[in-house]
Each structure stands twice: as C-alpha cells, then as structure tokens.
C-alpha cells in the first residue's frame, strides 16, 4: 500500500444535521455517557468501538476537539472536521487485529487525558493541543499490520519510497496530510499560513517520534529535562522554547502510544491478545516466504507473558517512570497500575520444563 492509492471518502454528512457525537448510532445515550469520561484514564475504549458502530476514532476525535472548544477557537467547521475524521478512519485498515482505528482512538483518548495533567495546566496553546490530538489521531493511518523491519527486509514499496528510514511513520504522515486535500476535508483551512506551518512541523515531529527505534534517544532527552526541570510560580512546568515544548509533546504522544500496559488489566489483556495476533500473522508470512521469523512473531514458539514483562521492564516502565517524575505527582496512579500489571504477567509465566 502506498500513497498512490486513491484517497477517497464517502460523505455521510450530506444532510444538515451533525450527529451529536459525530457518528450515527442507535446507542447515542450510552455512547454519550462513555464519552463523558474522555478525560478519565482507563475508559472502556472497546465499548466505545461497539457503541459507535465501528467508528471509535471519529467519536473520540470529535468529542475531544469539541469539549476543548478547538473547533471554535481554531475556526474549524464541524462538518469539515467530521468529513476529515470519517475519511481518516476509513484509511485505517479494519482487518489489522491491533493497528486499526480503535488503537488510534485509544491513543487519542490517552493523549487527551495526558494533556489535562495539572503540571501542564495552561502550558500549551490551543494550536499545540490541536497538533498533539491530531498527531495521535493520524499516527498509524494506513498501517499494513507489519513492522518497519519486515518492510525493510522484504524490500517493500514503502521501504523503497522512504529509504528504510522510519518507513511506516513517514507513510502515516504523508497519508494524513494528503487526506486534508480531499474536498471538504481541510480542517485547517482557516488557520494563517504561519499557524499551518507550525502545526505541520509539530505533527511531523510527534508522529516520527512514535518510531520505536527513536525510543532510547527520546527517553534520554526526557531524563535530561527532568534533571533540569524548571517550574513556574504556579507549580506548572516552565517550557519557554520550542525545543522543550515539542520534546514534552513528543514524549506525551509516545507515552499514550505505549499506554496499554498502564490500563486496567482487562483492557491491557485484550490489547496484548490483539497485538500478538498481528505479530503472529507477520510471522506466518515470514515463515511462508522463508524469511527469519521476527522476535515474538512465531505463534508456535511464543512466550507472551515473558515478552510483556520484558517489554515493561526495558521500555514501558523506564518511560512512564520518567514521565511521572516530570509531572510529579500527577501520574502516580498510572505508574502503580503498570507495576501491578507487570506483577500479574510475571506471575503468569509458565514454569520452565525441568532439564532433560
């Protein structure tokens, strides 16, 4: 799949009425109750997926933008916003077990909560908040359900296009900005040129930072920021230059992208099952094509519980611990849940067979 594929959308909003939560659903009341919890960590996003009739990203994006009054502040027409959201959601691959529009809705909702953290109160401008939410919405659009490494190893069209560098992340960005050019989909039509340029730069910086190969350097920079942390009189973080501001936003979206293990255990377990199925499907392709099977992708040799503990210990916990330091004490509950979930998976590791 490349950008060349026609980026079309069906306009479901030719009527005058804009649906209350951005999606046509017979479950409006119950959906509304759940979306009322959009600023709570651990909302049941799977239920939102069901109640929104398979359009969780549209519902979450519309609710987040409207509740923050971003449509009025940035002069985004509601119908344009919905036309874009529906089109964006259609360009997520429904057949991917994990990297589909439900994951995008989840990351957007998590980003929305993190932006509300007291340590960041009134730190970011409406344009910056919009950029972060937009980046979360688009960050995996048209994901093929395969890793960067697979795309590079198989000399895919996309790897050729992007010279093996952040292949997927470059593609997600290109598709997202291309979709804005569709008729009636340019949500930034009323921004000044300078604002558009700033927003575009921020979104690119944030989405490229979701490439896991950038994780260690992103975390190193975050640790440095924690060590030199400056706080304004009101107790909120003092971020007085673009480099510091975008660095916090990049890490915020990265945290949201790696937030599954910090959610209530029943949600986390569902996400793990979906991600493993996507990995296994890649492993099946690798086996068929005579390629080496990627780590964690062999369904006949998987150590799911052990993999999760390792993922938490080496990647997720160091990131969230550092984020929690930055916004102390705002993220303590999130960190506690992460540690409980780690202990659960540790306890579920099957005992090794005795040596022969």
Question: Where are the language model's segments positioned?
Answer:
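Divalent metal-dependent phosphate-bond-processing catalytic cores, especially two-metal-ion Mg2+/Mn2+ enzymes
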Residues: 2-59, 64-70, 113-126, 137-356
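Short, contiguous, pocket-lining structural segments
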Residues: 76, 99, 103, 124-125, ...
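N-terminal charged/capping segments associated with class I S-adenosyl-L-methionine
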Residues: 51, 56, 74, 97-102
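Hydrophobic alpha-helical transmembrane segments corresponding to the first two to three helices
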Residues: 85, 99-110
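Active-site alpha-helix of zinc metalloproteases
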Residues: 131-135
């Amino acid at each position: 799949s490349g950008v060349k594929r026609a980026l079309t959308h069906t306009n479901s909003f030719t009527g005058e009425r804009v649906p209350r939560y951005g999606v046509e659903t017979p479950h409006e009341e119950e959906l509304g109750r759940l979306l009322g919890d959009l600023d709570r960590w651990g909302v049941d996003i799977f239920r939102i997926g069901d109640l929104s009739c398979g359009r969780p990203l549209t519902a979450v994006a519309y609710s987040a933008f409207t509740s923050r009054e971003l449509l009025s502040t940035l002069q985004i027409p509601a119908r344009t916003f919905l036309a874009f959201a529906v089109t964006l959601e259609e360009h997520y691959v429904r057949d991917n077990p994990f990297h589909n529009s439900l994951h995008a809705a989840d990351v957007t909702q998590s980003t929305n909560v993190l932006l509300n953290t007291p340590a960041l109160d009134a730190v970011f401008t409406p344009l910056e908040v919009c950029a972060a939410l937009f980046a979360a919405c688009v960050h995996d659009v048209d994901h093929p359900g395969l890793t960067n490494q697979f795309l590079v190893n198989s000399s895919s069209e996309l790897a050729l296009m992007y010279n093996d560098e952040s292949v997927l992340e470059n593609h997600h960005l290109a598709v997202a900005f291309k979709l804005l050019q569709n008729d009636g989909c340019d949500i930034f039509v009323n921004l000044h040129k300078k604002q558009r340029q700033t927003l575009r730069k921020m979104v690119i910086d944030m989405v490229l930072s979701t490439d896991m190969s950038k994780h260690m350097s992103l975390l190193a920079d975050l640790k440095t920021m924690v060590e030199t942390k400056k706080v304004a009189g009101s107790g909120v973080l003092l971020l007085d230059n673009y480099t510091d501001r975008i660095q916090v936003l990049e890490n915020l979206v990265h945290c949201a992208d790696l937030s599954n293990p910090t959610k209530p255990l029943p949600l986390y377990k569902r996400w793990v099952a979906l991600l493993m199925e996507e990995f296994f499907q890649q492993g099946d392709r690798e086996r068929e094509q005579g390629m080496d099977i990627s780590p964690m992708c062999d369904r006949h040799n998987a150590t799911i519980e052990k993999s999760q503990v390792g993922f938490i210990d080496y990647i997720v916990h160091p990131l969230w611990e550092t984020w929690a330091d930055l916004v102390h004490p705002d993220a303590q509950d999130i960190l506690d849940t992460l540690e409980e979930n780690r202990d659960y998976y540790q306890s579920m590791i099957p005992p090794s067979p005795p040596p022969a």
